[in-house]
Design a protein with these regions (language model features):
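Class I S-adenosyl-L-methionine-dependent methyltransferase catalytic core
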Residues: 1-121
Length: 121
């Protein structure tokens, strides 16, 4: 793997000032192009389609993994917040646990995992 950073839930890359940062492999389980209720275009276009619960990478592949998973429980499927941030399933505890396991697995020794603050709403 030639990239040092893995973002496993990149979504619309809102985390980044440079949304084309060459150091980052942007992954998400979905692709989306839509117009939000306020008229702005919103695009989810990962470099690679991948599910954070089952990452297609070798052990110890990345120096930094960014894990900013969906955090919404009670929101409609087509709601503005669901489109932008994703939506948890009823099995969210097990799914996030599996995601953590996968993030740790693909991290190099003495590397860093960045977890964006989870606030379940």
């Amino acid at each position: 793997m030639s990239k040092a950073i893995l973002d496993v839930c990149c979504g619309g890359r809102m985390f980044y000032k440079n949304k084309q940062d060459e150091r980052v492999l942007f992954c998400d389980k979905r692709e989306l192009e839509t117009t939000l209720c306020d008229g702005r275009k919103f695009v989810v276009k990962p470099d690679m389609l991948a599910d954070f619960r089952n990452l297609p990478f070798d052990d110890e592949s990345f120096a930094l993994v960014i894990f900013d998973p969906p955090h919404l429980l009670k929101v409609g499927d087509n709601a503005y917040m669901a489109l932008k941030y994703g939506k948890l399933t009823p099995e969210w505890k097990a799914e996030l646990g599996r995601g953590f396991d996968e993030c740790w697995r693909v991290l190099k020794v003495a590397a860093h995992l960045y977890l964006s603050g989870l606030r379940l709403t």
